[in-house]
Amino acid sequence: MLRLGVSLQPRWPIDDETAALRAASHAEDLDFDHVAVGNRLLDSGFGLDADPLVLLSAVSAVTTRLRLLISVLVAPYYPALVLANQAATLDVISGGRLILGVGTGWNPEEYDAVGVPARERGARTDDHLAAAKALWAQRPTDFDGPFTTLRAARLGVPPVTPGGPPVWVGGHSDAALLRALRFGDGWYGTGVTAAEVSGVGRRLRELDRGTGNVERLTLASAVFLTPPGIAAAVPAPGRPLGGAAPTAASVVDDLGRLAEAGLTACTAWLPIAAEHVEKAMDWIAAEVIPQLT
């Protein structure tokens, strides 16, 4: 069965700091699989751009079952030790519900602001993931990488999940797919079609070169959905799920095709105003989730 989650995107009014928590609680009540939060450091212009690790820590306190997905954390923004310790902390306080989505990012202004050369983002992501995996797996840890050196390091908070929280690697390039095969428990796409999912699966098998790592990977993606009767507040940054005028039937058909192509988890990104998010969740829960098999 395709596991369906919903994204808590940064469109919450600045003066309503509890809106995202209410929406997360509602998502759990409606039996969604997960909620997802992105990673922006500078104002996106959409509303409240909360830190994903901090916001999901708050979400973990008002939920008990819902999985918590960061989609995705820009790994080079954080020193490897800080990333590993923060993720392990959230893994512990959530009872093992964290899914750490990781990507290289793209925003040159944010890279300049954190003092990290954007040209190093791929190499830094690989370094930080390798270091984090080492810190999560053993204590003490020695590690030598191009950007991280550790000697007999003991992570302040060991994760509750053996080996650390599952890592979903975002990106469509060969470098991203190789990163998923090397470090990931899953691959995370954006706005994919069934043909693109099939293509990613084929490319992963080709790049795997017989190691068998591909067999452990979850294939997941964000999709863009504006339910009928609700106006879009911002343009969807990709192909709309169910077409330009979606119905329950067209959305279920699209999701079925994605599942047949190999997708096993899907996050609904809702380009709508904050006051309509719970109504949109209600529609998905009533009209879509019961038809997913």
Residue ranges and their predicted role:
Residues 15-27, 82-86, 169-179, 246-258:
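Short, acidic/polar
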Residues 6-18, 73-81, 162-172, 235-249:
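Active-site mouth loops of central-metabolism enzymes
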Residues 25-29, 56-65, 87-97, 181-182, ...:
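Acidic (Asp/Glu)-rich catalytic clusters
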Residues 119-160, 190-293:
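An alpha-helical appendage that flanks or caps ligand/catalytic pockets
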